[in-house]
């Protein structure tokens, strides 16, 4: 079975189980933390895929990465994934769970990447209001600081990308020359 199907099926099953338990939001935060830790620490993926590491240690490591250690539903979901030999897919499962949660709750993920921290709260509020009117959903808004874009901004809304960065414009000029 391909990785996408496995991840999607597990994510949906975990979401439905969490929904029954009334813990879907707690699991969402745990899965966000887990996905973030996989992105920040590549050694985490290596550790999870290490055949010499016992299942119990993998479970403990994943629960620690979620930063929500007292939730029974989260522990149970991680145990099922690891015990079924699907630890290799856990990063994808976490990302698919996030997607499943946002879809069911009507949340739209918007991410603004700038060179400097956006301190203008009024501009953020206007942008969130504009996006929520256009998407007919609630906006989950994140700002990211990235000095590599030189100037301007990059706005990502779900699968749409608006790249108004100086770096992209310089690359376009470079390609034309």
Swiss-Prot record:
The UniProt GO MF terms for this protein read:
proton-transporting ATP synthase activity, rotational mechanism
Q: Which family does it belong to?
A: Belongs to the ATPase delta chain family.
Quaternary context:
F-type ATPases have 2 components, F(1) - the catalytic core - and F(0) - the membrane proton channel. F(1) has five subunits: alpha(3), beta(3), gamma(1), delta(1), epsilon(1). F(0) has three main subunits: a(1), b(2) and c(10-14). The alpha and beta chains form an alternating ring which encloses part of the gamma chain. F(1) is attached to F(0) by a central stalk formed by the gamma and epsilon chains, while a peripheral stalk is formed by the delta and b chains.
What is any one of the record's Gene Ontology cellular component terms? proton-transporting ATP synthase complex
Its name, as the record gives it, is ATP synthase subunit delta
Please give, as recorded in its UniProt entry, the membrane topology of this protein.
Peripheral membrane protein
What is the role of this chain?
F(1)F(0) ATP synthase produces ATP from ADP in the presence of a proton or sodium gradient. F-type ATPases consist of two structural domains, F(1) containing the extramembraneous catalytic core and F(0) containing the membrane proton channel, linked together by a central stalk and a peripheral stalk. During catalysis, ATP synthesis in the catalytic domain of F(1) is coupled via a rotary mechanism of the central stalk subunits to proton translocation.
The record lists the lineage as: Bacteria, Pseudomonadati, Bacteroidota, Bacteroidia, Bacteroidales
Which Pfam family, an example, fits this chain? OSCP
Entry keyword set: ATP synthesis, Cell inner membrane, Cell membrane, CF(1), Hydrogen ion transport, Ion transport, Membrane, Transport
Query: Which PANTHER family does the entry link to?
Result: ATP SYNTHASE DELTA CHAIN
Give its localization. Answer: Cell inner membrane
């Amino acid at each position: 079975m391909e990785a996408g199907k496995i991840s999607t099926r597990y994510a949906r099953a975990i979401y439905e189980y969490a929904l029954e338990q009334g813990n879907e939001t707690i699991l969402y935060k745990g899965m966000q933390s887990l996905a973030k830790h996989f992105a920040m620490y590549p050694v985490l993926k290596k550790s999870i895929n290490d055949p010499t590491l016992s299942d119990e240690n993998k479970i403990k490591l994943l629960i620690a990465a979620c930063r929500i250690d007292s939730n029974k539903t989260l522990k149970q979901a991680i145990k099922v994934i690891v015990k079924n030999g699907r630890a290799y897919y856990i990063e994808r499962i976490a990302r698919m769970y996030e997607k499943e949660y946002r879809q069911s709750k009507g949340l739209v993920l918007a991410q603004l990447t700038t060179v400097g921290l956006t301190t203008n709260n009024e501009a953020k509020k206007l942008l969130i209001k504009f996006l929520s009117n256009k998407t007919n959903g609630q906006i989950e808004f994140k700002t990211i600081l990235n000095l590599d874009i030189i100037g301007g901004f990059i706005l990502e809304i779900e699968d749409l990308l608006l790249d108004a960065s100086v770096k992209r414009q310089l690359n376009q000029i470079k390609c034309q020359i």
